[in-house]
Each structure stands twice: as C-alpha cells, then as structure tokens.
Amino acid sequence: MAKPTKGKAPRRSRRNISAGRAYVHASYNNTIVTITDLDGNSVAWSSGGTIGYKGSKKGTPYAAQLAAADAVKKAQTSFGMAAVDVIVRGSGSGREQAIRAIQASGIEVRSIMDDSPVPHNGCRPKKKFRA
C-alpha cells in the first residue's frame, strides 16, 4: 500500500535585498534588463520580448521602458529592493528610456555607469557599420 504524502514542503522565507545592480543590455534588436544582488546573482529580468513584443518592435524605446519597469517591479515585490546601481551596455535605441524608467519606478538610482564594449580596433565591421 502506498504511503500517504506529508503535504507541502515549508516555503522558504523571502530574502530581503536592499541594494543591487541593474544591467541594461541595449542592442539594436532588443533591450534586456537584469536586476542582480551585489554578488551578481540574478534576482529579476525582463526584455522587450517578455513584455509581448515581437520582431523589430522589441528594439524600440517604449519596449525598453516597459521591460525596465517590469524588472524593477519584480525585484521590489519579490525581494524588497530599494536601491540600484545602473550599468548600461550597448548602444541600442532603448538605453536612455530604460534608465529613465528605472528612475521613475520609485527605486533609488545610486549611480549610472556605461560599460559598453568598445573594440581596440578588432574585427573589421560589416559594410553597414563602416563609416
């Protein structure tokens, strides 16, 4: 005869994270916003695609704004995050709007840093990216 189940396992208590980092990866095709704790462990993320946009609409500033607001909302409700350092990578059209959305969402922005990868004259760019 089968043993009866013991019921649900106890829920883990909510980790309270007061500060973290918001990484904004802004490419020409999409904008991905990831919220991490100070150790770099991912807490919440969102992108133009997870908001519901497809194709070229994912790269728009409005999609970046919604993605940033969604990621911050997840981090605030799940972990009680109150302050972030914003780190921006890439030169897509959504980068400024994502920063503005993070600032407007009620979370304290302690610093903004641009960490865009810049080649030291590496590979030859494609035809459309050459000046």
From Swiss-Prot:
PROSITE patterns: RIBOSOMAL_S11. GO terms for cellular component: cytosolic small ribosomal subunit. Signal peptide: none annotated. One of its GO terms (molecular function) is rRNA binding. SUPFAM superfamilies: Translational machinery components. It holds the Pfam family Ribosomal_S11. The keyword NAD does not apply. Keywords: Ribonucleoprotein, Ribosomal protein, RNA-binding, rRNA-binding. GO terms for biological process: translation. Gene3D superfamilies: Ribosomal protein S11. It comes from the Bacteria. Located on the platform of the 30S subunit, it bridges several disparate RNA helices of the 16S rRNA. Forms part of the Shine-Dalgarno cleft in the 70S ribosome. Part of the 30S ribosomal subunit. Interacts with proteins S7 and S18. Binds to IF-3. Belongs to the universal ribosomal protein uS11 family. HAMAP family: Ribosomal_uS11. This is Small ribosomal subunit protein uS11. It comes from Deinococcus radiodurans (strain ATCC 13939 / DSM 20539 / JCM 16871 / CCUG 27074 / LMG 4051 / NBRC 15346 / NCIMB 9279 / VKM B-1422 / R1).
